[in-house]
């Protein structure tokens, strides 16, 4: 970032606001005192500056505008959404500003790295290698920040202090990661440097690796125990920082490393809300693929969709609405389960069968009881009038006289018998027909229940098969994940081994160069001594 600023000539930094004067109008007059009095204005008479114009200006001018004009920078802060700013000043200037007069011999040698090894060893004997300068920097800080791996290795071999903090509470490891000095980072990690120490902004070495999109360094830090959920003072985890800075590749990397997708910043915002506020549709889509919570609210009570609507991010609105529709379809399909419906119908049918079985014996028992009651009434009347024919009614006596000299009760009994016998015959026929109907119903219901039970059994078998398949797939996925982790670890170890080989080669080459230089120095000394001797001899001859 600093390289981009420093690479621009000084003249262009003065011309830039005047070139934009015709477009910026009164906003430029309000923000930049250098543009006042120019007399040019294309903005309305109100004189109020437009925040949307400032955003478009920042997007066009980029980091140049933020560095040259503090009013555009917002005191080192980048706006996200309608409220809640994040301080980006921690990432502005990664390298140290060094003045020669502020450093002693050891610190100069560590910073410049152009001192022979023998001289460094002598310096380390004479002075304290953990000594600090005015900004509380040790020799290890300066060597790591400037990428002088030889000095770093020498200090590590001498067992210097690894986790000393400078004036911004940064360790040598943080400075090496911040300045993207990979060799020094690996050397420090191998010697036990702590990757979870936070600087004054709350950032760890992993935060700076994510900001720089350095996946190799992020892998190495995680391999050596860096905390993937560490939060800085803005409440940003490495994942939230990657989303905020729209670093899609490192966001993918952190998702694979199982970073918490529901982590909240100090304003209660999730990664999805941050991605929506930044207007990054690709990161929003990436997070939606991980089934994140769309309905979560921040401290202001707003959701991701509300931010998308207020910011007029139409593509993101479509993505969120499509995701909600898919989720609703899943929920409806889970609620309307056909297997559960089959179970309910089978239970209802079994209950109906039980009720019909209980009702049929009651009918069977009621009909013979009615016949018994009728027979009892007839027998009682016969007993009453059998011995006393005078007490009979008139219609009965008339019937007796007309009955061929027989008693009056005999024809009456004869006439009553067939009447009493006709009713049971019809009742028996109806009873038998009802019984046949009931048996047919029972058979049909039993057949239906048998069919439904077969269907339930088949459905259960299918469920068991699906569950077995899911279990097998989960086992295979877990096995694949383990294999992937082992491969990643082996890859990292191979990369570290390669870097170690490169370091050894560079050491060997530097040693050879030092030996050659020493030989040249000795040869030069010998030549000088010879010339001095020759000159002395010549002087003695001339004097004689």
UniProtKB/Swiss-Prot annotation:
Regions of compositional bias (Basic and acidic residues) in chain numbering: 340-355, 364-375
SUPFAM superfamilies: Ankyrin repeat
Region (Disordered) residue spans: 332-457
Compositionally biased spans, kind Polar residues: 439-457
ANK repeat residues: 135-167, 168-200, 201-233, 234-266, 267-299
Coiled coil: 457-538
Family statement: Belongs to the POTE family.
Name listed for the protein in its UniProt record: POTE ankyrin domain family member B
Gene: POTEB
């Amino acid at each position: 970032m600093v390289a981009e600023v420093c690479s621009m000539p000084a003249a262009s930094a003065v011309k830039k606001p005047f070139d934009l004067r015709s477009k910026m109008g009164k906003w430029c007059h309000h923000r930049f005192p250098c543009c006042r009095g120019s007399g040019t204005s294309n903005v309305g008479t109100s004189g109020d500056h437009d925040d949307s114009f400032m955003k478009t200006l920042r997007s066009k001018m980029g980091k140049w505008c933020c560095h040259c004009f503090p009013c555009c920078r917002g005191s080192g802060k980048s706006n996200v959404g309608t409220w809640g700013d994040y301080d980006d000043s921690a990432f502005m200037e990664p390298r140290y500003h060094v003045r020669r007069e502020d450093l002693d011999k050891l610190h100069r040698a560590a910073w410049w790295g152009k001192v022979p090894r023998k001289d460094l060893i002598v310096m380390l004997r004479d002075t304290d290698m953990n000594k600090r300068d005015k900004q509380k920097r040790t020799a290890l800080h300066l060597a790591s920040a400037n990428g002088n791996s030889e000095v770093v290795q020498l200090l590590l071999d001498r067992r210097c202090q690894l986790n000393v903090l400078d004036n911004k509470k940064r360790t040598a490891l943080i400075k090496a990661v911040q300045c993207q000095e990979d060799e020094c980072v690996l050397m420090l990690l191998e010697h036990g440097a702590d990757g979870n120490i936070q600087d004054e902004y709350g950032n760890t070495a992993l935060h700076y690796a994510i900001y720089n999109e350095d996946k190799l360094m992020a892998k190495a830090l995680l391999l050596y125990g860096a905390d993937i959920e560490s939060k800085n003072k803005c409440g940003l985890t490495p994942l939230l920082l990657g989303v905020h800075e729209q670093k899609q590749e490192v966001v993918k990397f952190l998702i694979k490393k199982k970073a918490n997708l529901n982590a909240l910043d100090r304003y209660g915002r999730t990664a999805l809300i941050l991605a929506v506020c930044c207007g990054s549709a690709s990161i929003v889509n990436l997070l939606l693929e991980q089934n994140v919570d769309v309905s979560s609210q921040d401290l202001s009570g707003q959701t991701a969709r509300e931010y998308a609507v207020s910011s007029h991010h139409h593509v993101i609105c479509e993505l969120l609405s499509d995701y909600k529709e898919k989720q609703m379809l899943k929920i409806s399909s889970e609620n309307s389960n056909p297997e559960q419906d089959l179970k309910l119908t089978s239970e209802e049918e079994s209950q109906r069968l039980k009720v019909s079985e209980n009702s049929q014996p009651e009918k069977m028992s009621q009909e013979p009881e009615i016949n018994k009651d009728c027979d009892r009434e007839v027998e009682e009347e016969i007993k009453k009038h059998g011995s006393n024919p005078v007490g009979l009614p008139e219609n009965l006596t008339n019937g007796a006289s007309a009955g061929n000299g027989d008693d009056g009760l005999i024809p009456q009994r004869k006439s009553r018998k067939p009447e009493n016998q006709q009713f049971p015959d019809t009742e028996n026929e109806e009873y038998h027909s009802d019984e046949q109907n009931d048996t047919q119903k029972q058979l049909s219901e039993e057949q239906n229940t048998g069919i439904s039970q077969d269907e339930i059994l088949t459905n259960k078998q299918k469920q068991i098969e699906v569950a077995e398949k899911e279990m097998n797939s989960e086992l295979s996925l877990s096995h694949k994940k383990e294999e992937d982790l082992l491969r990643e670890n082996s890859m990292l170890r191979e990369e570290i081994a390669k870097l170690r080989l490169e370091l050894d080669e560079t050491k060997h080459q530097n040693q050879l160069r030092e030996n050659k230089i020493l030989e040249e120095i000795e040869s030069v000394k010998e030549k000088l001594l010879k010339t001095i001797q020759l000159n002395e001899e010549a002087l003695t001859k001339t004097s004689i």
